[in-house]
Amino acid sequence: MTKDLNKKLVLGILFIFPLLVYLFFASGKNNFAKLPILTEKVNELPKGYLGEKIKLKNKITILGYWGGDLKNKKAEALNLNEKIYKRFYQFDDFQFVFFVDTFQIKQVQELKNELVKGVGTDISRWNFLHTTAENMKTHFSSLKTPFLLDESGNTPYVFIIDKDLSLRGRNDDEDSGTLYAFDARSVAQINKKMIDDVKVILAEYRLALKIYNSEREK
């Protein structure tokens, strides 16, 4: 009995300890804390104009709103592709989703071509949701942030949405106090903050999965 218990304890430590170490080093000042929830019950995604059925539920999502402004989004897209997507796209349930205007079909394809040409990455987890300006505004308002979309339905800010449709971010950021989103124009902010925060939320879910699997094996 004691031997079995000791064996389970050792196995538990072997599974969990490396994840705790990873979480500690990946999370910067967040240490072992989960990435804070800033807004709960973000709206689920509407069905796309082209029949897209992309969902936030049960996904870890980098969410953006580019509206009808794709011609000016190449730099932001390449920043995110190189610094975030390329680094994390192989994690289960990780995705990028960007709202775009219903008439941006050609522009989306051109941008995808640039992304592939830029880093040669599999971009199957880059999702573009074609929808109306009204749908974009309605969904954006459910984030409950201080930001606004411009007239074309665009913002340079991208958001982390967890599997339960909650907006994650920082509530103790040294620069802004509450950090709702990341400026895709700023390589410095992506490097300094966004990479760390994506690592934290991915490690959080990996740790939860390890604990769940460990409990099932008992």
What are these regions (language model features)?
Residues 1-49:
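N-terminal targeting signals for export/organelle localization
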Residues 53-81, 96:
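Short active-site neighborhood of thiol/selenol oxidoreductases, capturing the structured segment around
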Residues 57, 91-94, 153-156:
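Extracytoplasmic
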Residues 68, 102, 133-134, 163-165:
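Solvent-exposed coil/turn segments that connect beta secondary-structure elements
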Residues 74-129, 133-139:
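Structural microenvironment flanking redox-active thiols in thiol-disulfide oxidoreductases
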Residues 84, 88, 143, 147, ...:
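Sec/Tat-exported extracytoplasmic proteins
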Residues 132-154:
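Surface-exposed short loop/turn segments
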Residues 154-218:
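Thiol-/selenol-based redox modules, centered on thioredoxin-like
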